[in-house]
UniProtKB/Swiss-Prot annotation:
Bilayer-spanning residue ranges: none
Listed GO biological process terms: inositol catabolic process; isoleucine biosynthetic process; L-valine biosynthetic process
Function noted in UniProt: Involved in the cleavage of the C1-C2 bond of 3D-(3,5/4)-trihydroxycyclohexane-1,2-dione (THcHDO) to yield 5-deoxy-glucuronate (5DG).
The family this protein is said to belong to: Belongs to the TPP enzyme family.
Stretches the record annotates as Thiamine pyrophosphate binding: 442-522
Name the UniProt record assigns to this protein: 3D-(3,5/4)-trihydroxycyclohexane-1,2-dione hydrolase
Species of the source: Clostridium tetani (strain Massachusetts / E88)
UniProtKB keywords: Hydrolase, Magnesium, Metal-binding, NAD, Thiamine pyrophosphate
GO molecular function terms listed in the Swiss-Prot or TrEMBL record: 3D-(3,5/4)-trihydroxycyclohexane-1,2-dione hydrolase activity; acetolactate synthase activity; flavin adenine dinucleotide binding; magnesium ion binding; thiamine pyrophosphate binding
A single cellular component GO annotation: acetolactate synthase complex
Gene assigned in the entry: iolD
Residues where Mg(2+) binds: 493, 520
Binding site for thiamine diphosphate: 65
Entries under CDD domains matching the protein: TPP_IolD (cd02003), TPP_PYR_POX_like (cd07035)
EC code: 3.7.1.22
Length: 644
């Protein structure tokens, strides 16, 4: 047996260079590169290996461990999970910073390989710098925190353990049904130790992503169920995008006259203008999708996890005869809502069912309901896109909470921009193939309803974990995947303040991204949530502490985000009118460096809900009668929702 005597870290890098995936006969390099933030836990091991021989791996210097890992996740998501970046950090706080990103990847079923440094396997210098000592178990380190949020976790305590660890890492990373974060903890002493690795460990490996076919019995059962139903509705989930099943879904929808609503992950698999596309569904959905869903007698979930936002906490589907059919590569997700399960690749499952349904001459009983629902929504969309602030008697979309804050904001920031008006303008101003990105706050809800993608895969929303701070980091990852397109991060002031470190990386690397920063001086989405459930405005607006009351009810906090970003070397714009917005967008397209457009947005001018409900933890008892009333409303809605 031929062997190669190299360090554990060198073997790791050599192995990563030999990983490929194959889908539909086309081969892709699986590990495109690695994001690094070096510390004592990885610089002399992985760092040395990368300096000496990185192979084809592109090495990027991150500026926050969570940020760089979120960039890696966005790259994999935009690449339909066919390529990934690895991420390496030091021990302790550097590793802990990646835990949030690991959860983001796992919640969304997106592959990311995390390689945190670890304490010494020998324990000779214990406690090493940044080590957490647990007196009841000395084998525990910070990296054990990854176990709860990883799809596969391992620690390489001896060089020879690297082989089985990495074989299993690739097994999970390339498994469409079970992918997510993979964490391989690497003790810093082991990284530098040499071992005679067998040559065959480094052979080229092609991981074939199989299009798992459905069973014959599952197809027969699915066809019989659909034939019994008159008004089915398809839910287009993220699996449609990752399976590249958009054309199959369109054919299925057309053949049988079945409309579909989109989840956040599924949106833009098919362009907005397609006649049977009802748009966003669920808590953040529009009136077209939600009204059809309410009366549907069969819900066909394709590649969806049926989250609470998709099902309105299982309240959305009100037809007494409604049943569920799932087409999903994951048996776990396919098993939800007592559904009839078709465990299959989305594309193959749709095509196989369609062939049999067509042979039996099936068609839904929809007449003009679909067209009417879409027309009504388009009227509402037009209204939303044309809402303008008038100083007198202006009623915001989210009315009755703290209407006076709108006037206060207008006077303080000299801006009359409403959020829906700005989104309407952006719909027209951005290039058709531009990619918009979001994750948290009120923007995902608004975008799910009102964004009208003109091209496929141009809507990139992380709403499985809805991680504040994903937005800017993700823009870099998306740009790495789609270098020829303009990339726009739509982010609120709250999320931007939490994390925007990889904006610096974009500048250093010459990877232009565009930040559209919606500043409404607070956590506006959560302010809406608390006030719509009876609370007052409490610690969700960005205000100075009032010296008289001792509370956070002083003047609004004014932040010049454009000035701050200018110091990074970003091209910036300040926007408080539609004309300035139009200029900023057009001028930003001419720039070669990253841009930030600081848009001052009137509070409470985001969209409201449409025939939706969300189950949240309202207090069962309060001195506030409004909260007691909100609790009663919750109980009434729960009575109409499925129990599981």
């Amino acid at each position: 047996m031929e062997t190669i005597k190299i360090t554990t870290a060198q073997a790791l890098i050599k192995f990563l260079n030999q990983q490929y995936v194959e889908l539909d006969g086309q081969e892709y390099r699986f590990v495109q590169g690695i994001f690094t933030i070096f510390g004592h836990g990885n610089v002399l091991g992985i760092g040395q290996a990368l300096e000496e021989d990185p192979g084809h791996l592109e090495v990027y210097q991150g500026h926050n461990e969570q940020g760089m890992a979120q960039s890696a996740i966005a790259f994999a998501k935009q690449s339909n999970r066919k390529q990934i970046y690895a991420c390496t950090s030091s021990v302790g706080p550097g590793a802990a910073n990646m835990v949030t990103a690991a959860a983001t990847a796992t919640a969304n079923n997106i592959p990311v390989l995390l390689l945190p440094g670890d304490t010494f396997s020998t324990r000779q210098p214990d406690p090493v710098l940044q080590q957490v000592e647990q007196t009841y178990n000395l084998s525990i380190t910070t990296n054990d925190a990854f176990k709860a949020v990883s799809k596969y976790w391992d620690r390489v305590n001896r060089p020879e353990q690297l082989m089985t660890a990495m074989i299993n890492a690739m097994r999970v990373l390339t498994d469409p049904a079970n992918t997510g974060a993979v964490t391989i903890a690497l003790p810093q002493d082991v990284q530098g130790e040499i071992y005679d690795f067998p040559e065959y460990f480094f052979k080229k490996r092609v991981h074939r992503i199989e299009r798992t076919p459905p069973s014959k019995q599952a197809i027969e059962d699915a066809v019989e169920l659909i034939k019994r139903k008159k008004k089915p509705l398809i839910i287009c989930g993220g699996g449609v995008r990752y399976s590249e099943a958009a054309e199959s879904l369109k054919r299925f929808s057309e053949k049988f006259n079945i409309p579909f609503g989109e989840t956040q992950a599924g949106k833009s698999a098919i362009e907005w203008s397609y006649g049977l596309n009802l748009g966003g569904i669920g808590v953040t959905g529009n009136s077209a999708a939600n009204s059809i869903a309410k009366d549907a007698d069969l819900i066909i979930g394709v590649g969806t996890r049926f989250t609470d936002f998709t099902t309105c906490s299982k309240f959305l589907f009100q037809n007494d005869d409604v049943e569920f059919l799932t087409i999903n590569i994951s048996s776990f997700h396919a098993n939800k809502l007592d559904a009839l399960k078709v465990i299959s690749d989305a594309k193959v499952g749709l095509d196989t069912i369609a062939n049999e349904l067509e042979r039996q001459g099936y068609s839904s009983d929809y007449e003009d309901e679909i067209k009417k629902a879409k027309n009504e929504w388009e009227k509402e969309l037009n209204r939303l896109f044309n809402i303008e602030y008038t100083e007198k008697e202006f009623v915001p979309e989210i009315a009755g909470h703290c209407d006076k804050v709108v006037e206060e904001f207008y006077k303080e920031f000299d801006s009359c921009l409403t959020q829906t008006k700005v989104l309407g303008e952006l719909n027209e101003l951005l290039d058709d193939d531009a990619i918009v990105i979001g994750a948290s706050g009120s923007l995902p809800g608004d975008l799910h309803k009102v964004w009208c993608p003109k091209r496929s895969n141009t809507y990139h929303m992380e709403y499985g974990y809805s991680c504040m701070g994903y937005e800017v980091s993700a823009a870099l990852g998306v740009k790495l995947a789609e270098e020829d397109k303009e990339v726009y991060s739509l982010v609120g002031d709250g999320a931007y303040l939490m994390l925007h470190s990889e904006l610096i990386t974009s500048i250093k690397e010459g990877k232009k991204i565009n930040i559209l920063l919606f500043d409404n001086a607070g956590f506006g989405c959560i302010n809406n949530l608390q006030m719509s459930n009876g609370m007052g405005s409490f610690a969700t607006e960005f205000r100075h502490r009032n010296s008289e009351t001792g509370k956070l009810d002083g003047k609004l906090l004014k932040i010049d985000f454009a000035k701050s970003a200018e110091g990074y070397g970003v091209k910036t714009y300040k926007v408080n009118t539609i004309d300035k917005l139009r200029y900023a967008i057009e001028d930003s397209k001419k720039q070669k460096i990253s841009t930030l457009i600081d848009i001052k947005i009137l509070p409470k001018t985001m969209t409201r809900g449409y025939e939706s409900w969300w189950h949240v933890g309202v207090s069962e008892k309060s001195k506030n009668p409004k909260i007691n009333k909100a609790y009663e409303s919750k109980i009434n809605h729960l009575a109409k929702a499925r129990k599981y």
